[in-house]
């Protein structure tokens, strides 16, 4: 028996869902009873969540890069101090 990788299975399932959705639309059936306001609220919520996640991620990355928080970083700081290379 052939085994399929995870990506192939996911793409196939999504293709089937898209085909079923398109067929239902062609037959005049609404596959999902969603109001436009609900879509707008979801888009706003996703934008806000993405914005918060991006801000937190970039803040933590900048903090980590600009501070000597690891053992290696502390050794680098001490070496810079010993050679008078810090401000």
UniProtKB/Swiss-Prot annotation:
Q: Where are the transmembrane segments?
A: 45-64
Please report the record's description of how this protein sits within the membrane: Single-pass membrane protein
GO cellular component: a single term: membrane
Q: Which gene encodes it?
A: xhlB
Spell out the subcellular localization from the entry: Membrane
Q: What is this protein called?
A: Holin
Q: Does the keyword Phosphoprotein apply?
A: no
What Pfam families does the entry give? Answer: Holin_SPP1
**What start-end ranges are recorded for coiled-coil regions in this protein?**
none
**Family stated for the protein in its record:** Belongs to the SPP1 holin family.
Keywords from the UniProt entry: Membrane, Transmembrane, Transmembrane helix
Chain's role: Involved in cell lysis upon induction of PbsX.
Q: Which InterPro entries match?
A: Holin
